[in-house]
């Protein structure tokens, strides 16, 4: 006689019956429940994530070589970031293997540099090289809990989305926080009144940057007591913060003047050296308005140089994803051979410098130069060659 219990579908792995699980998926000759599926997924994702960022697979020189393919100049910053990232991913691999011996703490990164010099590009290139989830946010959109705006957990939600809600993968990802200098506190002394978008945000960021178990609302928005949340361990998430820090050069120069002269000698009309930012110390960042505890969470500092005309010309034409190569490809799809004279590229670079937009503004300038040609030429099958000269660049920019 057949036992009735034998007729009830059950998981072939854990043995739970259909009425005791949420879902039971049927195969040709077996069943698997939702719990066992989740368990298998976590095991596989952990192995894949560790493989993707295993420190044995790359060296600092490998990282720098990859930077060189996409980023022009900035040699010092490339080396600093290459070493910092290499050590970071050695940390969590080493901590897993030697959990009872020495625990290595992570070193988050601060990138200082003017607008359009490549701060965001560094972070994006790193994430692409490491093949890990990446999220980018603007520090000015974050406010303290209880106030209008995003709270710090929303940063982690974006990282979780980038990882397709794979928690294990997200916990090995990279977060880039832009405009970090905009959340400096309003005065040197600790604030007595509430500063919801300055010192308060720095305080809120401290825990997740150091390492904590954060409760993240999967749908975004402010948390409320009855809301479902996802737990994320931020211990191995690499945080990279970037900002222009306008005025920091004067703070450094004044400190050096005090140390040299023995008394306070405020700089009046004396021009500050463009390389002085590379001499930044934690105390200068505190003077700027970053709280000491926050500065302490960013022990690695990379300073980017302001891009010169030659740098911008190189950015236009040399990297793998250079704009000139992109437009040559686009015109080539219409069987048009596009080229630029050297003077044309120099004129584009000078325009970016004049507008103070750096490399970030190059695409907008190139679009304004090529827009009419991209509109007219696809309809004109007789044109096979287009050479952009200095005169064309000047004329097209004058018309926009």
UniProtKB/Swiss-Prot annotation:
This is ATP-dependent Clp protease ATP-binding subunit ClpX. InterPro entries: AAA+_ATPase, ATP-dep_Clp_protease_ClpX, ATPase_AAA_core, Clp_ATPase_C, Clp_protease_ATP-bd_su_ClpX, ClpX_bact, P-loop_NTPase, Znf_CppX_C4. Zn(2+) binds at residues 11, 14, 33, 36. GO terms for biological process: cell division; proteolysis involved in protein catabolic process. PROSITE patterns: CLPX_ZB. Belongs to the ClpX chaperone family. ATP-dependent specificity component of the Clp protease. It directs the protease to specific substrates. Can perform chaperone functions in the absence of ClpP. GO terms for cellular component: HslUV protease complex. Keywords: ATP-binding, Chaperone, Metal-binding, Nucleotide-binding, Zinc. ATP binds at residues 114-121. HAMAP family: ClpX. Pfam families: AAA_2, ClpB_D2-small, zf-C4_ClpX. It comes from the Bacteria. The gene is clpX. Residues 1-52 form the ClpX-type ZB domain. GO terms for molecular function: ATP binding; ATP hydrolysis activity; ATP-dependent protein folding chaperone; protein dimerization activity; unfolded protein binding; zinc ion binding.
């Amino acid at each position: 006689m057949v036992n009735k219990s034998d007729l009830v579908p059950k998981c072939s792995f854990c043995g739970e019956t259909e009425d005791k699980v949420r879902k039971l998926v049927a195969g040709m000759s077996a069943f698997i429940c939702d719990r066992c599926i989740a368990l298998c997924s976590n095991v596989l994702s952990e192995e894949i994530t560790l493989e993707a960022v295993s420190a044995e697979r790359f060296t600092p020189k490998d990282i720098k070589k990859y930077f060189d393919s996409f980023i022009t100049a900035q040699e010092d910053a490339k080396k600093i970031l290459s070493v910092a990232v290499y050590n970071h991913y050695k940390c969590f691999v080493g901590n897993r293997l030697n959990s009872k011996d020495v625990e290595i703490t992570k070193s988050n990164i601060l990138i200082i540099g003017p607008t359009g010099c490549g701060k965001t590009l560094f972070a994006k290139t790193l994430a692409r090289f490491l093949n890990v989830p990446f999220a980018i946010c603007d520090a000015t959109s974050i406010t303290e809990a209880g106030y209008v705006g995003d709270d710090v957990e929303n940063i982690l939600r974006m990282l979780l989305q980038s990882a397709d809600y794979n928690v294990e993968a997200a916990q090995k990802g990279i977060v880039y926080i832009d405009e970090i200098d905009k959340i400096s506190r309003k005065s040197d002394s600790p604030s007595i009144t509430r500063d919801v978008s300055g010192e308060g945000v720095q305080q809120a960021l401290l825990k997740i940057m150091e390492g904590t178990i954060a409760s993240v609302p999967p749908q975004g928005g402010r948390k409320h007591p009855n809301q479902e949340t996802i737990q994320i361990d931020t211990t191995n998430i690499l945080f990279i913060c970037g900002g222009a820090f306008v005025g920091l050069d004067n703070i450094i120069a004044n400190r050096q003047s005090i140390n040299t002269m023995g008394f306070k000698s405020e700089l009046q009309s004396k021009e500050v050296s463009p390389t002085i930012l590379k001499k930044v110390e934690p105390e200068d960042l505190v003077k700027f308005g970053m709280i000491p505890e926050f500065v302490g969470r960013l022990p690695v500092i990379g300073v980017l140089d302001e891009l010169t005309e030659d740098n911008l010309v190189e950015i236009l034409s040399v990297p793998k994803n250079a704009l000139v190569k992109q437009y040559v490809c686009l015109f080539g799809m219409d069987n048009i051979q596009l080229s630029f004279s050297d003077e044309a590229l120099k004129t584009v670079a000078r325009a970016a410098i004049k507008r103070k937009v750096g490399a970030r503004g190059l695409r907008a300038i190139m679009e304004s130069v090529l827009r009419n040609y991209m509109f007219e030429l696809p309809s004109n099958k007789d044109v096979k060659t287009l050479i952009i000269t200095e005169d064309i660049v000047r004329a097209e920019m004058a018309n926009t």
